[in-house]
């Protein structure tokens, strides 16, 4: 019976890689996209090398790239050998219209950039607290933990700037009584055009300052007393005089 000729496989790169005379019109042709190259052809198929030379001669006679679809038509006209795996090559317009899909998911670093940038900057919430309701993240995320802590902080208390006359009145009241409560504090605050909270805080701070000054004075007095005793003891040792405790007042001598 008639035996069909064995199927032969070739690559487009093998056609254009051979040294062949090119027509003069090649320089005027537009640049075509480079064909996809495969691995170097191995000598497994004995008919492959001979077919490459014949196909190159045929392509040289017709002119390389004389037709935009020539490269792909050559590949279609000769079915590939089943022994050699060959992947179909799509035309250039198909490549442009359908880009290759990504084989893996995007990197987590780039995926995280799609999130709300405010979750990475707790100082933004601390600075603009009235926008806190717009920045709600996952309750279990560490970024959200930082944001909630920043929002949960109590605002700093504004320090009251007292006038000299107010300070003088407060000092006089403190000398009379270190604790002002009830109606007395309310009356004092009304006379100074202050709130009861401001008067209360001032007296608390003033009592703390008074105790600190008292401790410092007692500490300095004790240090001076110790220094004086030390000098007296040294003078007695130098002059070999007995201390008052060592003098026997019951002796008749």
Swiss-Prot record:
Annotation: DNA-binding region: 155-214
UniProt-annotated location(s): Nucleus; Cell projection, Axon
GO cellular component, one term: axon
Keywords annotated in UniProt: Cell projection, Developmental protein, DNA-binding, Homeobox, Nucleus
Location of region: Disordered: 213-253
Keyword Glycoprotein: no
Record function comment: Transcription factor, which in cooperation with EMX1, acts to generate the boundary between the roof and archipallium in the developing brain. May function in combination with OTX1/2 to specify cell fates in the developing central nervous system. In the inner ear, it controls the distribution of GPR156 at hair cell boundaries, and regulates the organization of stereociliary bundles in opposite orientations across the line of polarity reversal (LPR).
Name of the protein this chain belongs to: Homeobox protein EMX2
């Amino acid at each position: 019976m008639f035996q069909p000729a064995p199927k032969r496989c070739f690559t487009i790169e093998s056609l254009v890689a051979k040294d062949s005379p090119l027509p003069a019109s090649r320089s005027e042709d537009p640049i075509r996209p480079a064909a996809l190259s495969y691995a170097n052809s191995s000598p497994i198929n004995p008919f492959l090398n001979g077919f490459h030379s014949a196909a190159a001669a045929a392509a040289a006679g017709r002119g390389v790239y004389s037709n935009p679809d020539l490269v792909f038509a050559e590949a279609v006209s000769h079915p590939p050998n089943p022994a050699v795996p060959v992947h179909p090559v799509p035309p250039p317009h198909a490549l442009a219209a359908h880009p290759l899909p990504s084989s893996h998911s995007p990197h987590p670093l780039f995926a995280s950039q799609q999130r709300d940038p405010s979750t990475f900057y707790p100082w933004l919430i601390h600075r603009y607290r009235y926008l806190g309701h717009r920045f709600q993240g996952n309750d279990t995320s560490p970024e959200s933990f930082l944001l909630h802590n920043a929002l949960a902080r109590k605002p700093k208390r504004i320090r009251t700037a007292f006038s000299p006359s107010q300070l003088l009145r407060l000092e006089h009241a403190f000398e009379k009584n270190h604790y002002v409560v009830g109606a007395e504090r309310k009356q004092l605050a009304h006379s100074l055009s202050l709130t009861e909270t401001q008067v209360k805080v001032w007296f608390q701070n003033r009592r703390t300052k008074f105790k600190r000054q008292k401790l410092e004075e007692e500490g300095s007095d004790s240090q001076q007393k110790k220094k004086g005793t030390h000098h007296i003891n040294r003078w007695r040792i130098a002059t070999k005089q007995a201390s008052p405790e060592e003098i026997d007042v019951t002796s008749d001598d």
